[in-house]
């Protein structure tokens, strides 16, 4: 995929990166930033109808402050996003357009971020397979949005190495990572740890609990399991089932409109992750024998 994007980027005017509005930083792929750094970028915060509106505004302002970058939010219910996407791309590359110089746009995104659904909406037909299980998109395809506007699709790409632990949990909570790749109980505990600090009223309303902010994560998960009837023999809570309930309620926005990171938080996580990763790489290099 890296090779395919590298080849295509040479003849691309604008790169659209589709992000999950509930976790914009974590759903961005650092490899794309590296490969496309010289190209104008349109960041599309998809699923904004599931995200915290105030935090979406923070992220849009953050991306719009970056050079050569525009950002817009999209709702899943939006039926005519093509006009907004085309207009934003023309703002970024005003020198392109018309039959002699058609706009060439690359669209990228991690698995399950809603890229296939968006492409289907843009084209008005089932051009791409859709579903809610993280998976592999077919090979690159060209989609004509207007007589002078070509959109090139790419397979969904996850981080080559997830160096930010919190991002790994957020990606798993959102459904970007296949079920076999993570422990649901761990993910639910991380999710609850954040939600009880930032979205306590939503948790309390949904699960009919009080003072969740002061509860330990394991106690909170157990209390939710009991409230939701996730019980097994001996009237014990089935923590696996309770974890599945919490993750499902987040994904389906049953807990309300939630965003799992702000630009400031993500910046801190990334800085810490890069530091740890640099130390790890240095140790790894030290262990390798010197070449003669």
Which residues does each predicted region cover?
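Canonical P-loop GTPase G-domain recognition
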Residues: 42, 48-109, 127, 229-231, ...
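Glycine-rich, N-terminal phosphate-binding loop of Rossmann-like dinucleotide-binding domains
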Residues: 19
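Helix-rich effector regions associated with P-loop NTPase G domains
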Residues: 1-14, 22-23, 28-41, 48, ...
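Generic structural marker for isolated residues within well-ordered, non-membrane alpha-helices
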Residues: 60, 116, 221
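Short, well-ordered alpha-helical segments in soluble proteins
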Residues: 89-96, 111, 122-126, 134, ...
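Alpha-helical scaffold segments in soluble metabolic enzymes
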Residues: 84, 88, 117, 190, ...
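Short phosphate-engaging motifs
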Residues: 81, 114, 150
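Glycine-rich phosphate-binding P-loop
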Residues: 105-124, 128-130, 154
């Amino acid at each position: 995929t890296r090779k395919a994007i590298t080849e295509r980027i040479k003849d691309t005017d604008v790169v659209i990166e589709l992000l999950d509005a509930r976790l914009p930083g974590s759903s961005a792929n650092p490899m794309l930033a590296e490969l496309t750094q010289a190209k104008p970028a349109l960041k599309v915060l998809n699923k904004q109808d599931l995200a915290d509106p105030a935090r979406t505004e923070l992220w849009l302002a953050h991306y719009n402050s970056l050079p050569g970058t525009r950002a817009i939010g999209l709702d899943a219910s939006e039926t005519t996003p093509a006009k907004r996407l085309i207009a934003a791309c023309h703002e970024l590359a005003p020198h392109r357009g018309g039959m002699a110089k058609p706009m060439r746009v690359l669209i990228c995104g991690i698995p399950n971020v809603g890229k296939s659904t968006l492409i289907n909406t843009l084209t008005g037909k089932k051009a791409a397979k859709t579903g809610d299980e993280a998976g592999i998109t077919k090979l690159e395809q060209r989609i004509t949005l207007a007589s002078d506007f070509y959109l090139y699709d790419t397979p969904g790409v996850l981080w080559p190495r997830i160096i930010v632990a919190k991002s790994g949990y957020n990606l798993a909570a959102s459904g970007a990572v296949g079920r076999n790749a993570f422990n649901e109980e761990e993910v639910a505990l991380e999710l609850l740890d954040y939600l009880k600090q930032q979205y306590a009223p939503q948790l309390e309303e949904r699960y009919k609990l009080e003072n969740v902010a002061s509860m330990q994560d394991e106690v909170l998960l157990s209390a939710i399991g009991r409230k939701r009837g996730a019980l097994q023999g001996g009237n014990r809570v089935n923590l696996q089932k309770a974890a599945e309930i919490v993750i499902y309620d987040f994904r389906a926005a049953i807990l309300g409109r939630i965003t799992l990171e702000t630009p400031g938080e993500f910046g801190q996580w990334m800085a810490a992750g890069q530091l740890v990763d640099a130390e790890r790489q240095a140790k790894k290099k030290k262990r390798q024998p010197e070449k003669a």
